[in-house]
Amino acid sequence: MDVNPTLLFLKVPAQNAISTTFPYTGDPPYSHGTGTGYTMDTVNRTHQYSEKGKWTTNTETGAPQLNPIDGPLPEDNEPSGYAQTDCVLEAMAFLEESHPGIFENSCLETMEVVQQTRVDRLTQGRQTYDWTLNRNQPAATALANTIEVFRSNGLTANESGRLIDFLKDVMESMDKEEMEITTHFQRKRRVRDNMTKKMVTQRTIGKKKQRVNKRSYLIRALTLNTMTKDAERGKLKRRAIATPGMQIRGFVYFVETLARSICEKLEQSGLPVGGNEKKAKLANVVRKMMTNSQDTELSFTITGDNTKWNENQNPRMFLAMITYITKNQPEWFRNVLSIAPIMFSNKMARLGKGYMFESKSMKLRTQIPAEMLASIDLKYFNESTRKKIEKIRPLLIDGTASLSPGMMMGMFNMLSTVLGVSILNLGQKRYTKTTYWWDGLQSSDDFALIVNAPNHEGIQAGVDRFYRTCKLVGINMSKKKSYINRTGTFEFTSFFYRYGFVANFSMELPSFGVSGINESADMSIGVTVIKNNMINNDLGPATAQMALQLFIKDYRYTYRCHRGDTQIQTRRSFELEKLWEQTRSKAGLLVSDGGPNLYNIRNLHIPEVCLKWELMDEDYQGRLCNPLNPFVSHKEIESVNNAVVMPAHGPAKSMEYDAVATTHSWIPKRNRSILNTSQRGILEDEQMYQKCCNLFEKFFPSSSYRRPVGISSMVEAMVSRARIDARIDFESGRIKKEEFAEIMKICSTIEELRRQK
C-alpha cells in the first residue's frame, strides 16, 4: 500500500506541519576516525573565551591552569567566561529569598541519599574512562577494576558497599605516594597450526603489575576521556563529549542529586521532568505571563540560544554556588559536595586516539598517538591542524591537555540549570524595580524568556538587562541565534508552542520500524510505539492505521514471513507454506509464522500471542509456548520488558512493552571472536560479575529486595537470607529436617571460608 504523503497534510494547520521540516528521517550522521581534532577545538575555544584570566600552575601535577573568575567585565558582545563570584552568590541569595527553605530542604533530602546510596549506582551508564587501562570500558568493569586496584593498595572502605565509603577511598588514594595497578597487554606469537600446517598468529593476554607515582595517578584520576558525539542531526560539524573516570563520577552524582532536588522545586526548570509533565509545567509559566499582560502590557517571548554554554561555565563558580547552598550544613556534607567542582577545576582532557597518517605512494599507514603531539614535527600536518597543535602544546602533559575552565558536555546539567533559573528569578518586579519584568524556562543550556512591559521600549530594556545580567555569571545569550516573537509562539527544547504545545511528531520517527531484537519483541515494540504516539503525540487514527500497515509490511520483509498464501518467494517460503496448509485455523498463526495481521488501532495494547490464542490450533499452541522446546535458548521472562527506542534527539529512552514468552523470543549467541582478543580477560571479569549479580537476585526476589543497609557484604547478606528462608520453609513443612540441616551446614562452611580468606 503506497501512500501519497501530501494527503496527510490536507487538514493540518501550518504550525503543525513544522515537524516535517526537521532532519529526522533516514540515518543520522556518525563520526569516523579520531575525535582528537574536535577535542583540541574544545580545549582551545574554552581557553580563548577565558583568555584574560589569571594563569597559575597546579603544584601537584604541574599543569598550567587558567582562572577567569572575577575577570574583566565584558565590553563587547563576544562570548566570555568571566563570571563574577559576588553576582552568582547574590543571584543564589535572591533565589532563596523567593523560595524560602528551598536549599535547606534539598540539602536534607540529599544527605539522606548520600547515606543510603550503594556503590553499584556507579555501574549504571555505558562507556566510562577506565584509568587502570587508560581507555574506555563498560561502567561495571571500570568500577570493578578500580575497586580491585584500591583493594590491592590497602584501601578497603568500599567493601561495605556504600558509595560514600568508596569516595573516602578515592580521597585517600590521592594522598598515596604511589599506586600499584594491573594492566593487560597482548603477546603475539607465530606458531604452526597442527591441522593445516600453516603459520598462525596466536595472541595471549598477560597481566602485569605497574607502579604509578602520585603525579601520574592524579593526572589519571582527573582525566576525562573524550569521544565524538554520534548521531547528531542538523549539524555539519561533529563535536567532542567527555566521559569521566570512576574517581569523579561518585562526587558528580551527589552534586547532581542536590541540584535535581532544587530543580524539582523550581517552576522555571525544564529538568528533571520530561514529556507531558514538562509541557504542563511550561504551559503554566506561559499562562501566568499572558494572564498578567492581557489588558495593559505587551508580552514578548525570546526563543533563546546560548553560545557555548559548557565552555563558558566554570567549576569555580559551581563551587561558590555549592558553598552558598550548603551554608549551615554539617562540615562532612559540605566537603563531599565541594570535591566535584574542585576536581573539575583541575581536570585534564584526554585527546583521544591521535591522528592516522597514510602515504598513498608507499601504501603505509601509521598512527600518531596523542602522547606524541607535544614533540612531533608539525610539517606533517595541514595548516588548520598545525594551528590547533601549536595552541594546545603549552597545556599538554602525557597526552592529556590541562583544561581548568569550562565544563565539558553533560556533566552538571542540573546545577547549571539552577544557575540559569536564578537569573530568570531576578525578573520579578520587586527586583527589576521598573515597569518591565520577565520570567521564563530553563533546561540545561536551552531557555525561553518571556518579557512583559507597557511598551516596546520597555521590552527592549528588559531584554538588554537580562542579557547583561547573564553576562555577569558567564552565560552568553547569542544575539544571532535567538529570536523574539509575540508571546504565544516559541520553541523550547524542541517543543513548539503555539497557544499550546504542538505535537512535534517527526521527533518520534526514528523509533518507528523493526528494532531487530527478535520476532516476538519486535512485534510488541512496533505496536507499542504506535500506541504511545496515539496517546502522546497527536498521531491520528487514520495515520496510525497506515503506520501499522507499513510496520507489518516492514516486519514481514525483515523476517521473511509473508503470509502463507502469498506469491512472494523468500528463503522461508517453503516452510511457511507447508505450515499454512497443515494449519486448520489459519487466523491463529502469528505474523512471524506467515499468519494474517489481526492488529488494528483498537487492540494495540494486547500482545499478539494473547490476541490469537483462542484462534490457534492446539498442537500449534503446544509448540509455540513450550519452555522445553529444544530449538530455543530462552531469556528468563518477565511480564514487562524494556526496549531502548531512539527518539530524534536526546538520549535513547527506555520504553516498556509486554513480553509474552514464546519460541520466537530467542536470543542470538554472542560472537566468539572476542575470545581471542585482549578483551578476553575483561569478558571473563564481566561474566563473573554478571553471575554474582544473578545469584544475588535469586536470593532477593524483586518483591523483597531491599538494598542491604549497614555494613554487610553481598555474601553475608545472601547467607543470612538463606538461613531465614530455610527456617521459614522448615517450620512450615516445605522442606525436610535433613535438607534444613544441609543448608545450615553449607552456610557455616561459607562463613568459615570467608574467615580464612
Swiss-Prot record:
It holds the Pfam family Flu_PB1. Its main location: host cell. Residues 55-64 have a biased composition (Polar residues). It catalyses: RNA(n) + a ribonucleoside 5'-triphosphate = RNA(n+1) + diphosphate. Residues 50-82 are annotated as: Disordered. Phosphorylated by host PRKCA. Residues 286-483 form the RdRp catalytic domain. It is found in: Host nucleus; Host cytoplasm. One of its GO terms (biological process) is viral transcription. It comes from the Viruses. Keywords: Eukaryotic host gene expression shutoff by virus, Eukaryotic host transcription shutoff by virus, Host cytoplasm, Host gene expression shutoff by virus, Host nucleus, Host-virus interaction, Inhibition of host RNA polymerase II by virus, Nucleotide-binding, Nucleotidyltransferase, Phosphoprotein, RNA-directed RNA polymerase, Transferase, Viral RNA replication, Viral transcription. Its EC number is 2.7.7.48. It is an enzyme of class 2 (transferase). Residues 249-256 are annotated as: Promoter-binding site. One of its GO terms (cellular component) is host cell nucleus. InterPro entries: RNA-dir_pol_NSvirus, RNA_pol_PB1_influenza. GO terms for molecular function: nucleotide binding; RNA binding; RNA-directed RNA polymerase activity. PROSITE patterns: RDRP_SSRNA_NEG_SEG. A motif (Nuclear localization signal) lies at residues 187-195, 203-216. Belongs to the influenza viruses polymerase PB1 family. RNA-dependent RNA polymerase which is responsible for replication and transcription of virus RNA segments. The transcription of viral mRNAs occurs by a unique mechanism called cap-snatching. 5' methylated caps of cellular mRNAs are cleaved after 10-13 nucleotides by PA. In turn, these short capped RNAs are used as primers by PB1 for transcription of viral mRNAs. During virus replication, PB1 initiates RNA synthesis and copy vRNA into complementary RNA (cRNA) which in turn serves as a template for the production of more vRNAs. Influenza RNA polymerase is composed of three subunits: PB1, PB2 and PA. Interacts (via N-terminus) with PA (via C-terminus). Interacts (via C-terminus) with PB2 (via N-terminus); this interaction is essential for transcription initiation. This is RNA-directed RNA polymerase catalytic subunit. The gene is PB1.
